Design a protein with these regions (language model features):
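Flavin (FAD/FMN) cofactor-binding core of flavoprotein oxidoreductases
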Residues: 249-261
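Conserved N-terminal glycine-rich FAD pyrophosphate-binding loop of Rossmann-like flavoproteins
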Residues: 34-57
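Beta1/beta-strand and adjacent pyrophosphate-binding region of the FAD-binding site
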Residues: 1-13
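Conserved Rossmann-like nucleotide-cofactor binding loop
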Residues: 13, 36, 153
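Predominantly flavin-linked oxidoreductase catalytic cores and closely associated redox partners
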Residues: 108-247
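Glycine-rich FAD pyrophosphate-binding loop
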Residues: 6, 22-42
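A conserved beta-strand/loop capping segment in the N-terminal third of enzymes
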Residues: 51-104
Length: 261
């Protein structure tokens, strides 16, 4: 079958593309290399811009935990900022665990008429320098347009010439979920004075993103510009940050094993 659009990648970008195209009456197929229900490691925070994009697609986000602003902490200083009220975006964000968020968008894509296929790793088919479709499990599926929504580090992106600049600054992060009685708070919290177990400042930040379901997404991220970055142990850094927020958040033990990206 010839499709109008083939989408590689079932994250928010890919599923949003499939939703829009299917609603416009186009024949759309989306390929997700993971199974249905796969999780994507993330901080789970949605900005007002993201909520605005969901509104444009008429996506119901009422199940997500509403976030009204940001609490920033640097040393002993603390400041709370509300999301601004503008004509461009709503004045609130949300926390929506990626497993639930991504699955919801894929469900909407299917309901909109897109052909969504799981456990299907697709690669672009190139003929005479033109992408004419995708190959999945040895099968060639042709499409008038192929949309790559896998990120720049995937095999498909590299086939199309995406190359990472080795001198470009990058970051690493790790997160876990933990129970807290403060899970229903409506501010994201970011600690800008992150330190390792030796007390050395780390260029990055720690976060507490309340999920509204009894848990908080706790995580830390660091930039490659820091001295000794290659020796940085993210699990140790997360534990160090957790020791600081454990008392004020009445934080319980991690529900799952911390995962990095």
């Amino acid at each position: 079958m010839q499709f109008d659009i083939a989408v590689i990648g079932g994250g928010p970008g890919g599923s949003s593309t499939a939703i829009s195209a299917a609603r416009a009456g186009l024949r759309v197929v989306l390929f997700e290399k993971g199974p249905y229900g796969r999780d994507k490691v993330c901080g789970d925070g949605l900005t007002p811009r993201a909520i605005g994009a969901l509104n444009e697609l008429n996506i119901d986000h009422s199940v997500a935990h509403r976030i009204d602003g940001l609490r920033m902490i640097a040393g002993k200083k603390k400041r709370e900022l509300s999301w601004p009220t503008t004509d461009r975006f709503p004045n609130h964000g949300a926390v929506w665990p990626r497993q639930k968020f991504d699955n919801h968008l894929l469900d909407v894509a299917i309901e909109s008429g897109a052909d969504v296929r799981f456990n299907a790793e697709a690669l672009p088919v190139i003929e005479d320098g033109v992408v004419v479709g995708v190959e999945v499990n040895g099968e060639v599926i042709r499409a008038s347009l192929v949309v790559l929504a896998t990120g720049a580090q995937g095999a498909a992106a590299k086939m199309l010439g995406a190359v990472r600049d080795p001198d470009e600054t990058f970051g690493l992060a790790i997160r876990a979920y933990a129970p807290t009685p403060r899970h229903a708070e409506r501010h994201l919290e970011a600690c800008l004075s992150l330190r390792d177990e030796h007390g050395t400042p780390v260029p990055g930040y720690g976060w507490m993103f309340p999920a509204g379901d009894g848990t908080v997404n706790i995580g830390v991220g660091a930039l490659s510009t820091m001295k000794g970055f290659k020796k940085l142990n993210l699990n140790t850094l997360l534990d160090q940050y957790a020791s600081i927020v454990r008392e004020p958040w009445s934080l319980g033990d991690y529900i799952d094993k911390p995962r990095a990206w």
